[in-house]
Amino acid sequence: MATISWGKALLETTTSNDGAPEGTPTWKAIDTPKDGTTKLTATAGQEIEALEEGGEVVDSRRSKNKYQLEFDLFVKKGKERAWEDNDGIIAGEHAFRLTPEDEGCEGFIIDRCTLSVEESFTTADGIMLHYVAKVLKPKTGKMVKPYTKGA
């Protein structure tokens, strides 16, 4: 049993409609990403300061964080690609759910995001698909919500 949310995670996707996964969503497992490539990154929100003469800060506020989910998939013989793209652009809005290797640990759900892909090739890895999910404001709640399977 793990204490933290690490290891081989299960990454699943479904369609997002009106800012949330559709009705009772049917989550579809994505092929296992390349080792060490699945990551959720937060970018700190913009800091806004009210300055008085002399440059002293009277007040400050910060906008909300922005989030991005990234992962790389191998192109494998006999397997279909997870999404069709048009020169890197993947149509529609998507939702993602990540369940850690130890299902009792906390993962996350993203209700709404856009998805793009960058294709590359090296002789070491073959054809790789680098997916980038830009997280968008959901219908309700936080942009990245905690998720624990069975909870």
Where in the sequence are the language-model features?
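A generic structural signal for short coil/turn motifs at secondary-structure boundaries
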Residues: E80-A82, E119-S120
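Short, cysteine-centered beta-strand-loop-beta hairpins and adjacent loop/turn segments enriched
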Residues: K76-E80, K139-T140
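Mixed-charge, glycine-accented linear interaction segment located at domain edges/termini
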Residues: E106-A151
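Acidic surface patches and DE-rich sequence motifs
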Residues: L51-E52, P100-D102, P138
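Solvent-exposed edge beta-strands and adjacent loop segments
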Residues: M1-V75, R112-G126
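Short, acidic/charged, Gly/Pro-enriched secondary-structure junctions
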Residues: R81-G107
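Beta-strand secondary-structure signal
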Residues: Q68-D72, A95-R97, H130-K134
